[in-house]
Amino acid sequence: YDHAGLASWMTERFGVPLYMSLGEFLMMRMLGSQTRSVPQPEEQHFYARSGMPQDRVERVFEALRQDPFVPPRQDQFRRLRAGDVLTIGPRRWQVLIGEGHSPEHVCLYSAEDRLLIGGDQLLPRITSNVMVTAFEPEGNPLTLWFESLDRLETCAEGTLVLPSHQNVFRGVHARVGQLREHHQQQFEQLRHLVAERGRCTAFEAMLGLYPRLRGPEQDLLALGETVAHLSWLRQRGVLDCQLEADGIIRYNVVQSAIDEEMHW
């Protein structure tokens, strides 16, 4: 999509090679190989286990079928890894790898000029989408996301960030702190919501976290985000879950975590 949708056009138009991390290249190839005419079995299972009503699931699948995404035609690439240094014109750029939002999101940092091409990994006002997906339903992307924020904090104070959405900004450390606080608030909100309901599906938790969703595209993103937060709380021992006889996963707060003050 907006990560690599123009890769083929740029490489063909300018006669240049594609530089990319391995994880992003493989993800691009995998998404490009999937057909959108029929939902994949793993997608059907993912939504069924979430408890989302079937008519709402069908609207999500229909939105995916209508998606105009055309996968890049890329069979070769040059691999970027964390710590690599690229010399582009007068500047040297260090490769920083971010995870959570995308498998191996490449950021470029020029320490000498205090410049960070942050992409989707660090945005000035909105928060990057961090979600569990149907092809990795047991994933815990928020743990990877927080580790990536730690790496971004190594950038010097006063670094100018060039994000992929909205305006350029300064204040890497302050923004990282805001993002951590945002997710901490969501963890606390989810813990109380699940405790109040007793047994809670991911869909019910989604409606509690995001009560004003508009359309199937937002349902898709919000459900993935909700499951990511539920998975993180499971890893921390705050929640447990069970696949019940109706094929739906339901979450409970672990008894010892009901009234405990949490330190995220």
Task: Give short role names for the model-derived ranges.
Residues 189-264:
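C-terminal regulatory/interaction regions
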Residues 82-85, 105, 238:
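Short, acidic/polar N-cap/turn motifs at the starts of alpha helices
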Residues 85, 98-100, 244:
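Short polar/acidic secondary-structure junctions
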Residues 4, 145, 226:
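Aromatic/hydrophobic pocket-lining residues that form the small-molecule binding cavity
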Residues 59-75, 92-187:
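Metallo-beta-lactamase
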Residues 26, 123-125, 170, 209, ...:
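Feature marks short, surface-exposed loop/turn motifs that line or immediately flank catalytic pockets
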Residues 1-86, 114, 175-177:
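Active-site HxH/HxHxD metal-binding segment of metal-dependent hydrolases
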